[in-house]
Swiss-Prot record:
GO biological process: negative regulation of DNA-templated transcription
Keyword Nucleotide-binding attributed: yes
Pfam families for this protein: ATP-cone, Zn_ribbon_NrdR
HAMAP family listed in its UniProt record: NrdR
Zinc finger boundaries on the chain: unnamed: 3-34
Function: Negatively regulates transcription of bacterial ribonucleotide reductase nrd genes and operons by binding to NrdR-boxes.
Span of domain ATP-cone: 49-139
Keywords: ATP-binding, DNA-binding, Metal-binding, Nucleotide-binding, Repressor, Transcription, Transcription regulation, Zinc, Zinc-finger
Designated name of the protein: Transcriptional repressor NrdR
Membership in a protein family: Belongs to the NrdR family.
Cofactor note: Binds 1 zinc ion.
Cofactor: Zn(2+)
Length: 150
């Protein structure tokens, strides 16, 4: 590993331990040239599929975009930050396990709505109202009636 202080290409590991529940390996390294120490973190590279937007564009999956959308839907609702993070974790796991290279944004939106439906129905309706872009109050009422039937 290249030294951040002198740029020498070789260093040795002097300490290594798991961090963040074993998802990351923290390593203390010492430069073989200047003897200064620095820390590196090693983690598995996540292979998440590309997200296919309605207009045909493809984007890398953005967890923060998902978390932000869920937070907006859950604003002033009794949903903890931990609950939101767990929903995002489950979504990422589902994306990794689906084994596809590309996933339509519509499918991701449906998965998020299913998560919200199980946690807070008001947040679910808020998210659905933005995600589904209801054209009028009648479409919105149909969604509410479907929710009440479940």
């Amino acid at each position: 590993m290249k030294c951040p202080f002198c740029g020498h290409p070789d260093s040795k590991v002097v300490d290594s331990r798991p961090d963040k529940g074993g998802a990351v390996i923290r390593r203390r390294r010492e430069c073989e040239e200047c003897a200064r120490r620095f820390t590196t973190y090693e983690r598995v590279e996540e292979m998440l599929p590309l997200v296919c937007k309605k207009d045909g564009r493809r984007e890398h999956f953005d967890r923060m975009k998902v978390v932000s959308g869920i937070k907006k839907a859950c604003e002033k609702r009794p949903v903890s930050v931990e609950d939101i993070e767990r929903m995002a974790d489950r979504l990422e796991t589902r994306l990794q396990e689906c084994g596809e290279r590309e996933v339509p944004a519509s499918r991701i939106g449906e998965w998020i709505m299913n998560e919200l439906h199980a946690v807070d129905q008001v947040a679910y309706v808020r998210f659905a109202s933005v995600y589904r872009s209801f054209k009028d109050i009648n479409e919105f009422m149909v969604e509410l009636q479907d929710l009440l039937k479940k």
